[in-house]
């Protein structure tokens, strides 16, 4: 979740509920402070835990990743996400902002994931960084 800004923005813009997972207690404390001043803080939950241990709740149907962690941890997180969909089938979309090529290569090999779209975000920033994009996958069980 980092400082929680994406979660707070999304809950404000879309009226959704958001859960942010952060493992660093200092960054988590900053997210909690941001939540106090956020207009949509009541629809935002921040948890201090390791993402690879997180049990995905049944109501989760969108997951946002911002270049979050190592490929080894990503594998565990994707396993938990797909297991949640096997237990409780539903539409579930995964959004990867600023993904590493290693992430995309791995995600393309996961049988339960289907590539949906790619949003080019290079126009939002100076330069031509090819990682400035959002790649979307759907869990397909």
In which residue ranges do the predicted regions lie?
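Glycine-rich SAM-binding Motif I of class I
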Residues: 4-8
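Gly/Ala-rich phosphate-binding loop of Rossmann-like dinucleotide-binding domains
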Residues: 11-12
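Conserved SAM-binding motif I beta-strand of class I
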Residues: 17-22
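S-adenosyl-L-methionine
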Residues: 29-58
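C-terminal substrate-binding/active-site "lid" region of AdoMet-derived donor-dependent transferases
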Residues: 72-136
